[in-house]
Each structure stands twice: as structure tokens, then as C-alpha cells.
């Protein structure tokens, strides 16, 4: 049996507050799961904070091929079928649907109710907040625990994972923008701060990204684990919704030409997965 330990990771400024209270102050907190050896594979292994992988033998690799993207329809939109479990309250269900619909306002992503499609996002309330990165095929779980995950910024965060995006602080150029203080990280959690080869889509590092961890993520001693450079006082991990750069990346990755033109960006001037 897999034994799970749950950690609610929040910035120091919100220590002692409930998850709901801290979110009202604009901080994003995550329920993180640590797995120990066992054979219960009913739920996927969760690595790197909130990224799901099918087994402990696989890495949460970046979405670097066209095969991990959701297909584009002839009308230029990307339709991502979804199913929401019945375990959510009506209010929570409404919040989730609003989060799904938020993508349609500024990107060509259209989350649509499941109608017998093979591949879809299966939104459930499991152990914490987590998602696979990119399209996995068939029903892929996005977990939004009823106890702490049904908030707009967290919904968008996990859906961005499902669309193919990783955490901001794992960017290949992150060392020019943040300093990682591993000496303050909980033992065994250092992998959450690994740097990976990412497609940055011609966009700058974004401290305001909804995909960015907070300053005290995984801290073992109430000291910072991520410090912006050169200005250490820049706010990170406090996004309440997708930033303009988050939106730009979605539009670039999925070639949302109409929306790129609205943002005054050329739709064909950056490298994309093959």
C-alpha cells in the first residue's frame, strides 16, 4: 500500500492561516503528496509538486512533440473534452466550469463536455491537486481535491499542465531569473526544483505566471527556497489567474492565430514541436 503524506505548502506570510484564508490574500498553496514504496497504483505517482506520471519508472518530461498536444480542428479551435466527477458540490462544479471557460476568452482552447470522444480530461477530487503534462490519451486525470484545490488559479494551473506546460521555475533559463536555495528545501523534495529543457516560445521569464511556485515552496525551515534575481523583492507565486504571458504561450503553442493577432504578435515567428 502506498502511504501518503500531505503537505500544505504556502508562503511564510500565510503561515497559520487556512488554505482558504491564504488564497483570499492572493497566495497559491498546493497539497503535495509524497509516495513511499508500495503496489497500490489506483492513483498516478505525483512528482515535482503536482505533475502526475503513470508509474515510478517514468519522468515528468516536458511536452516537446506535437503528439503531446491536443489536436486542432478545421475551424482553428482546439477542443478538449472534459468530464467532471459527481463528487463535487454544485458550487464547486460552477467554479470548475468557469475555470474551463476562462481559456475561451483569450485563446483558441475550448473545453467541451465529453461526448464519447476517446481522449479527454477527467476532473476528479483525488488526493490533492495534480495533472499529467500534455495529452496522454484516453481519460487522463486532473485532480482538484474538494479540500483546497477548487480555486480559479489552481484550476487554470492544472489545466495548463494538461495542455503541455511545466512550472515556470523549471525553465531552461531560470538561473538568470531566480536563485534556488536547496539548503532550505525539505529533504527528498529537491527534485521539485530541477531544471528541464523547455520550449519557452520566445517569451520572457514570467514572475507573474500562474505556473510559478511561491517563495517558500517546500521550505523546511521557513526560509525562502526561490529568490528572484536581481531584485529579490519581486513577488512570485501570487497569481490569481493566468498572466498575459501565460495566455501568449498557449496561443503560440497551439497556433491560435486570431488571438495572436489580437495580442499584436506574429503567429508564425517561433519554433514549435515537430
Question: Which residues fall in each region the model found?
Answer:
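Zinc-dependent metalloendopeptidases
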Residues: 2-274
